[in-house]
UniProtKB/Swiss-Prot annotation:
GO molecular function: ecdysis-triggering hormone activity
Gene Ontology cellular component terms for the protein in this record: extracellular region
Family from the record: Belongs to the insect eclosion hormone family.
Disulfide pattern: 40-64, 44-60, 47-75
Localisation: Secreted
Signal peptide: 1-26
Stated name of the protein: Eclosion hormone
Length: 88
């Protein structure tokens, strides 16, 4: 009888836990500390991979260091990466 009661409690707790997973909305970057300069430089590297020789990755990284990560480039936003694009 005790085993059945324990099994029912475990199943009920598992169901309650799974139901509450949907309500847990948090961003890992906000839940833990993050370094804006690190994200900025990583985005520069990602844009360099995407655009290849048309993107000045070193210039982008230098601007991250000078601005201390305040202006993070987004590869899909032309306005944020236009200073780092070249015509070849």
């Amino acid at each position: 009888m005790a085993n059945k009661l324990t099994a029912v409690i475990v199943v009920a707790l598992a169901v309650a836990f799974m139901v509450n997973l949907d309500y847990a909305n948090c961003s890992p970057a906000i839940a833990s500390s993050y370094d804006a300069m690190e994200i900025c430089i990583e985005n520069c590297a990602q844009c360099k991979k995407m655009f290849g020789p048309w993107f000045e990755g070193s210039l982008c990284a230098e601007s991250c260091i000078k601005a201390r990560g305040k202006d993070i480039p987004e590869c899909e936003s032309f306005a944020s990466i236009s200073p780092f694009l070249n015509k070849l």
